[in-house]
Amino acid sequence: MRAEIITIGDELLIGQVVDTNSAWMAERLNEEGISLHQITSVHDDRAHILTALDEAFSRADIVFTTGGLGPTKDDITKHVMCEYFGTQLIEDPQVRTHIHELYKDRPEALNRLTATQWMVPQTATILTNRVGSAPIMVFKKSDTGAAFSSPSGRPLNSSEASTKHLIALPGVPHEMKIAMIEQVLPYLATTSEADLQRSDLLSTAQRSIIHRTILVSGIPESKLAILIEEWENALPSSIHLAYLPKDGIIRLRLSSYGDTTEQEIDAHIATLLPIISDYLLATEDLSLETIVGCLLKQRGMTIATAESCTGGRLAAVLNSQSGSSSYYIGSVIAYDNSVKTNILGVLPETLNTDGAVSESTVRQMAEGVRTLLHTDYAIATSGIAGPTGGTIDKPVGTVWIAWATPEGTEAECFHFGAAREREQITHRAVTEALVRLVKRLNNIVSIQ
């Protein structure tokens, strides 16, 4: 099943808003076996939207649109849809009731503009947007077998018309996500295969999509490719390997588009693991914080953090997981040296001699917070995130990280590069802190 996304809104094309919707939708659609072939962004402009719809329907079986469903004059998507599908707006009593209920505690939000939200295209199937006023609209061929209208004048044959769907979604990210999860994906799952599939689509076996992801760190991408070259060359043509490096972690994603079974792709992975064992983080596509949380809970152990240059970012990542209170005890944000000495017990002479950004300082920070909060593990960070503060000996991007464990304390210096922005440096520091922690806990993770 081929799909395309059209994102609608001037704000996307002037850089005011980043399109996060498409990335999220692409991942969800892929999980459902729906192949996304193209993403297009257009202005809030009638002609642009009509052209984008016509082009998308020439290629795809399902077209998703996001944005332009609000009540203001610049929100024209609903009106353009009416023109495209040859229909008109009518009042929907259920949508009206929903909107009144939505705003029952905010009566000032019910006005003549809000009232336009319960006007919907007559031929559309309407799905409820539980958290917003813009209903989800689904367009397809009519019960009479009428084909889609085409603004370019190109007739759509009956085979095309019987399979094409357009699903118009709100552009507000949290509304779109809830709409997809609660309404759109269940709708697609229950809509008949005959209604969704054209005769020229791929067979069921060919439509099967299987993904497996392996997390690797501590090796450059090029070196990894050389290491597994022989294994990669032996993969069947139905399995595609992608290298996806980001923030010091390489995701090896194996994708099967065909009749390869899960057992077959898992068998290939089993032969890969011994080759990359020195660099293996996890055998599933999990976040570092998920892996850390799982390992600590499995072992009944706890952790604390002492942060200088990362300023609480490490703490925020660790406690972002549900149930993290069972293993994450707390943090000391020791940005000023007085906090390092008075709370964490870093020796003043250490700071005077070696400086705040040094191996000895982060070791004492990690040991200090581990003792203070009575945890099994502790991580400490201290560095120069920039853009100022660097020296010849300690340039911007220099970060020391220490790990205090039941077996002792280790520290490592990282150079993330002076050209990176401050946020990038602190983000990399958090990533490396967790990567090294995972390897100390257990270098292979698979969550069942």
Question: Which role does the model predict for each range below?
Answer:
Residues 2-39:
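Glycine-rich phosphate/diphosphate-binding loop of Rossmann-like nucleotide-binding domains
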Residues 3-5, 166, 303:
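Conserved hydrophobic helix-helix packing surfaces used for dimerization/oligomerization
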Residues 8-10, 65-73, 170-171, 257-258, ...:
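Glycine-rich beta-strand-to-loop/alpha-helix junction loops that act as flexible
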Residues 26, 30-55, 91-132, 339-376:
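Glycine-rich oxoanion-binding loops at beta->alpha junctions
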Residues 48, 58, 75-203:
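Proline/glycine-rich low-complexity loops and linkers
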Residues 66-91, 272, 276-283:
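Flexible gly/pro-rich beta->alpha loop and the following alpha-helix that scaffold active-site loops
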Residues 164-268:
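An accessory alpha-helical subdomain
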Residues 262-448:
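Short alpha-helical segments enriched in small residues
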